[in-house]
């Protein structure tokens, strides 16, 4: 099959697509075997290597901010005379947009309530548990997440815009292995980047489709089982794949605009009806707790099972997303200095995320108290209902419920469309305008792999999705650690 890639140089495509297809077939024909392997891999990595995930992300934080404040921070991502392609306002808006994803919509209500009911330490259901839950949520969605994207984006932008190398993860290793980035070692690095992206996105799409199906059940009574979730994934996959094939760029842009406006509208609506003063108090308290406990929480492993199920999952998820988000922030940052890039990428989206989480989480706690535990009970029964349980406690639920589903759909379509672009680019030698056929192929494959994880996981679908991220992120985490050294070596060599 010719998917618009040079046949002589598409090793990454052939190997990646073959492994992806084998994974799908494994889940279809041997689901119980896959489920057993999933459980064993999850236990192995979280039990034996949890410490490494925590240390790696801590190293990433030190590295990326160290580079930014050093003399290398003045270096441009591009030629010395390159100007930024976008104004500051446009650039900031794009980075803010990067923070609005399926995961944020999914977890912004569910996670605070889940930590409130089962905190990592202390008594559940107390004021202290509420404060701890919001602190932990800020921790999981804060700087520790975005430093991963900053490192991948910095590597892609520096070696593409300043050195003229392909827009591939393997290019970041040129200072270490030279032209061997075009050989087996470089191909292996790009293949690992492909699978980190596939499983990181599959986790997000799995969560998003589950929430859509639950919303349909919550509002219209249609059961939200694996079949419904699979149909949701299939239908949306067909939509964005057809849009890609047809070249309906205006349609995709319209969907992106709807996502932004709906996101802002929901934030304003929930802030107004969710208890403005309570939310502002929640934001202030949570931000202070986050900053005060930043270092200690970074290395905290006293409750290994909790850390394995939450923090390590998040760190792996963000690492798996690094090639995906990294290429986005790199593409829009040509002409920026390293210092501008690092501080904008790590702080602006985090600020937006904190506001979002404080509004949704604060409103959830406030309205849960007023309703006598309605939201808490809903989350205990099924955490995917959290957002709809919150909206049910506010006016205009007949309107906001369906609009919430529309918001999740726009997030799903946007993430899937961007993911297929990244996967097509990674498997076409860094071509920044990959063929529609190749993007369509990865769109279909992405949907199929997400369905496999949902069906194989069954009642434990979340664990299957978590394991997919943790397992795919492990080798890429090691790649990112070496990548940090390679970036530093390049900077020292180019700017002694």
Swiss-Prot record:
The chain crosses the membrane at residues 11-31, 49-69, 89-109, 136-156, 188-208, 219-239, 260-280, 306-326, 341-361, 396-416, 441-461, 468-488. It is a multi-pass membrane protein. Induction: Highly up-regulated during growth on glycine betaine. Probably acts in the uptake of glycine betaine. May function in the pathway that allows anaerobic methylotrophic growth of D.hafniense using glycine betaine. GO terms for molecular function: transmembrane transporter activity. Its main location: membrane. InterPro entries: BCCT_CS (IPR018093), BCCT_transptr (IPR000060). It is found in: Cell membrane. This is Probable glycine betaine transporter. Keywords: Cell membrane, Membrane, Transmembrane, Transmembrane helix, Transport. PANTHER family: HIGH-AFFINITY CHOLINE TRANSPORT PROTEIN (PTHR30047:SF7), HIGH-AFFINITY CHOLINE TRANSPORT PROTEIN-RELATED (PTHR30047). It holds the Pfam family BCCT. GO terms for cellular component: plasma membrane. Belongs to the BCCT transporter (TC 2.A.15) family. Disulfide bonds: none annotated.
